[in-house]
Amino acid sequence: MIPCRAALTFARCLIRRKIVTLDSLEDTKLCRCLSTMDLIALGVGSTLGAGVYVLAGEVAKADSGPSIVVSFLIAALASVMAGLCYAEFGARVPKTGSAYLYTYVTVGELWAFITGWNLILSYVIGTSSVARAWSGTFDELLSKQIGQFLRTYFRMNYTGLAEYPDFFAVCLILLLAGLLSFGVKESAWVNKVFTAVNILVLLFVMVAGFVKGNVANWKISEEFLKNISASAREPPSENGTSIYGAGGFMPYGFTGTLAGAATCFYAFVGFDCIATTGEEVRNPQKAIPIGIVTSLLVCFMAYFGVSAALTLMMPYYLLDEKSPLPVAFEYVGWGPAKYVVAAGSLCALSTSLLGSIFPMPRVIYAMAEDGLLFKCLAQINSKTKTPIIATLSSGAVAALMAFLFDLKALVDMMSIGTLMAYSLVAACVLILRYQPGLSYDQPKCSPEKDGLGSSPRVTSKSESQVTMLQRQGFSMRTLFCPSLLPTQQSASLVSFLVGFLAFLVLGLSVLTTYGVHAITRLEAWSLALLALFLVLFVAIVLTIWRQPQNQQKVAFMVPFLPFLPAFSILVNIYLMVQLSADTWVRFSIWMAIGFLIYFSYGIRHSLEGHLRDENNEEDAYPDNVHAAAEEKSAIQANDHHPRNLSSPFIFHEKTSEF
């Protein structure tokens, strides 16, 4: 009996959820100094990195041709689905932590730690790789003199390490980490300057492309491409067409456009850094959703315009995969424009680097504040109001990686952390919107201050009616003809269906990735399995759609629920399956290190665990409440609010201005 009780207690520790109360949304140790424009600049700068100067040429030449503009449109729509889920959580829970916090308040502590641990990895590798790219781009402007010097005098001949240590990248990371430690407002100002220069350069590229472009480059005939291939002595493709495709707007067909969209999806990664600023924004409930959606829109317009200008200036099959824009300008006779492009590329890399460094210490700070990482990492500088220990320590780790390692083999690990976070946030939105408690619990503030209250139909329900609905048992009738109000049974059903949906999507992704040849050959087993997966997917989504949602309103809510989050989960898991086996092995090693930290330290020092244990002790020994009051106040020193541990209630918008 005792081992079973211990196992049950251990399992409850893994799924305990963080309680975020209304008062704690304003309570922060950080400095609230960021505006909506600061968030837009941060999102655009982080997302619109150097990829806009390189990715368009690579995808247009190999996958999409001129239809790369459609590829970016599809990728933008897929990214917006994830962005909208982040936007709703940013409005509901405007606290530091991003996807880590959103997972913690919805599905529990273990999944939250997994999410946060992988976000840390993504930001560290992203910071290191962008710093080395910045160093390499600057070295190109100096005719590679820095690299030649370091290769001569500091060459490293060890497997897995870089060819030479990158001192320049180390200095760059430490400089920006120091800037962030100095203050968020100063960092935001520097970011806005670099982002503005980047946008101006991209506008120049678009205008120049449309002026010097030729629509004929979108209408190249197949015969012309065959002649080009024959003169270059290139063998034809398997279907008899040129290696450059069939010509026209979609030379590689719609499948090529979709393949390009999968690659372009990663060009929109980075907006999630906005969600880590919840405790540093003046009005986070409105600024975070606006910042996320606006930054994604601006980035799409930039990617769309640059890719259109590039393919109009130069035939897609002649594009240079590494430096498409400078080569394209030389092709149209504007050679000196390459210096403008180089300046824009350095500014883009600078904002991208700042966008990687900025959220990294904030996720670490949030996890340390909750007790899941070492408490010293939650220390806040009294003058600058920044997590100085987390900033400097994470910057030092990123600098060390940039100094020693060849990061090309590790970059794919960034994708796992990001895509997993996207998937979990979408799943959390589904689970949260069908919880029963959000409509019945009345916040301790007036409707006028609350801004958006519950609907009259819900608030007019008597307590006895609500209790009757909560006690309603499960049956097939409640599955297909549920009540008007969410119950605990309907919420549990949705939670189960969301989990089952994730495993179903995983199976569908594996089938369409590794069994695609069997599907194209119309083999019976593959078609039957594909049909089964699709039917179950549609049935589960429709069943979730039939369940009653809570009536609570916030500043921003994901539209088209549950279809949009479900499709976001499908896209993200499919892209995760595309990653190589070596990437998953490295990911497993990183997770093993994380689990060692969590099960040896985090699970025992969790703030939620201490507060729940204290609450249980008060229930068991009510006569000792006064004797334990002093200890309780010490534990709640960082909380400053009463807690309702029986409900995973997440408070809605509080429209006060900071």
Swiss-Prot record:
The modification Phosphothreonine is found at residue 28. Pfam families: AA_permease_2, AA_permease_C. Glycans are attached at residues 157, 227, 239. It catalyses: L-lysine(in) = L-lysine(out); L-ornithine(in) = L-ornithine(out). The lineage of its organism: Eukaryota, Metazoa, Chordata, Craniata, Vertebrata. Expressed at high levels in the skeletal muscle, placenta and ovary. Expressed at intermediate levels in the liver and pancreas and at low levels in the kidney and heart. This is Cationic amino acid transporter 2. GO terms for cellular component: cell junction; plasma membrane. It comes from Homo sapiens (Human). It is found in: Cell membrane. The gene is SLC7A2. The modification Phosphoserine is found at residues 24, 446, 455, 464, 646-647. It comes from the Eukaryota.
